[in-house]
Design a protein with these regions (language model features):
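Periplasmic/cell-envelope proteins involved in peptidoglycan metabolism and beta-lactam response
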Residues: 1-186, 194-200, 204-211, 226-231, ...
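Beta-lactam-recognizing serine transpeptidase/beta-lactamase-like catalytic domain environment
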Residues: 160, 164-211, 216-451, 461
């Protein structure tokens, strides 16, 4: 009898320990697990906190369900404009974006579980918290409109802090359609769209950068002391790839200058493929790779969701000068995200310091009190301040007298670099990166359009991406002066 009593006692002890683990110690872990059916059900019906922009625009909110006084309906007032940033949360199709990344902060804890009751007894606020983001709503809307009908991306960053001012992937989708009883069929329709609107082209897709990568190569050349803006290079019509019968030519089919020599400054202004291909081989893969890494290449950049890593594969290029020459002009093996190239522009604008991009500036409670406040951080120093000044001056010349003139803004000093990459014949990815004003940078930007944008195979970075970038920077700067 004593043995039976002991077994019963031990059984109750184990049961109590298990309940304590699941209901108290392990509650948060199991509650946040997406496989938890109860969590999935609660996502759609429980109150969630606000997601708000820096200028007070509400992007996500929970409204009382008119059919169920105990439930709430999630609503996205800006719909497609912020879809890739805010994401969605749905019992039927899951979650994405900030809704997923800040799941724990945004959700209500008033579930009346044992752990919630205990937390409330100790004074914990069980109401949902709210998320304040750095995006400028008007700039975001303007960027979405600029890319309407096209496949591409715009990323804008405040150079001194890394605050993300715009994060746009086009085409987009309406996250409101992923809510309610038709969520599954609506999401499937979006997934079946050949333009792939759910793809995050701004931060999770990789592209050849074309000639915007020449800014990185130029930085490597100047920082190493190998060249300055007035250093001269041979100016051939074509560059013969080492160990190959293939050649690289310039966009117009001729030399960049007089056909004898050309300066580094002019080579960047006119985007000379021949000069930068040769320069890349001379510098070597390691030197370029080190500079690229200091901008954020080949490393994980902290962000609310996992970004694709931009790559400059040093080990693959170190013993392949032909591939290095092609990669040095932004083709072949180098791949980037638009966010990464916005960081390149931001680092040059920020006197050589590459800012850590951040999207959430603050998490605040239901009483409006800040619980978490973002502190600007750096990825690292990409170049010395002196080198940054040289790059700023050379890139300003690109806009005043080179391939980026369509990005110019009346009365504002603008710096930039154009790019046109050819991942497939007749399907150019067109680019512009830049910043303004040069003397006191407030915005750095990257614009990329697939397939030449509205001009198709005749599109270039200068004709398509640069005017979009210029217009968006002007809109932001002018409003800043008047607002």
């Amino acid at each position: 009898m004593r043995r039976i009593a002991t077994l019963v006692f031990l059984s109750f002890g184990l049961l109590l320990a298990a309940l304590t683990w699941f209901q108290v110690l392990g509650a948060d872990r199991y509650r946040s697990d997406p496989r938890n059916v109860r969590t999935a059900i609660n996502i759609s019906g429980k109150e969630r906190g606000l997601i708000v922009t820096s200028d007070g625009t509400v992007l996500a909110q929970s409204n009382p369900d008119p059919d169920d006084p105990q439930a709430y309906l999630r609503v996205y007032p800006e719909g497609p404009t912020f879809a890739h940033v805010v994401g969605y949360t749905s019992r039927l199709v899951g979650e994405s974006g900030l809704e997923a990344a800040y799941r724990d902060e945004l959700r209500s804890r008033r579930d009346l579980t044992i752990s919630d009751v205990i937390a409330a007894l100790f004074g914990r606020d069980l109401r949902p918290e709210n998320v304040l983001i750095t995006i400028d709503a008007e700039l975001q809307r303007a960027a979405v409109a600029a890319l309407e009908g096209q496949r591409g991306a715009v990323v804008a960053i405040e150079p001194a802090t890394g605050a993300v001012l715009a994060y746009v992937s086009s085409p987009t989708f309406d996250p409101n359609s992923f809510l309610g009883p038709s969520a599954v069929s609506n999401r499937q329709a979006v997934l079946d769209d050949p333009n792939e609107p759910t793809r995050d082209r701004a931060g999770t897709e990789l592209y050849p950068p074309g000639s915007v990568f020449k800014a990185v190569v130029a930085a490597a050349a100047v920082e190493s002391g190998f060249a300055g803006p007035e250093t001269t290079f041979d100016d051939p019509v074509v560059y013969e790839l080492p160990g190959s019968t293939s050649t690289i030519g310039n966009a117009d089919g001729g030399p960049c200058g007089d056909g004898v020599t050309v300066t580094l400054q002019t080579a960047l202004v006119r985007s000379c493929n021949t000069v930068f291909a040769s320069l890349s081989v001379t510098l070597g893969a390691s030197a370029i790779g080190d500079t690229a890494s200091s901008f954020g290449f080949d490393r994980r950049i902290d962000f609310p969701w996992t970004l694709a890593e931009s790559t400059f594969p040093v080990s693959d290029l170190a013993n392949d000068p032909a591939a290095l020459a092609q990669s040095g002009i932004g083709e072949r093996d180098v791949r980037v995200t638009p966010l990464q190239m916005a960081l390149v522009a931001a680092a040059i604008a920020n006197d050589g310091e590459a800012p850590q991009p951040y999207l959430v500036s603050q998490v605040f409670n239901a009483d409006g009190e800040a619980r978490e406040v973002a502190e600007p951080r750096l990825i690292g120093r990409a170049m010395s301040p002196a080198t940054a000044v040289v790059l700023q001056q050379m890139m300003e010349r690109v806009v005043t007298s080179g391939t980026g003139q369509s990005a110019s803004i009346t009365g504002v000093r603008v710096a930039g670099k154009t790019g046109t990459a050819l991942p497939e014949p007749g399907q150019p990815d067109v680019w512009f990166i830049g910043f303004a004003p040069v003397d006191a940078p407030q915005i750095a930007i990257a614009v990329m359009l697939e397939d030449g944008g509205p001009l198709g195979e005749s599109g270039t970075g200068g004709s398509v991406a640069a005017p979009i970038a210029g217009a968006l920077m002007e809109r932001y700067l002018v409003r800043g002066e008047t607002g």
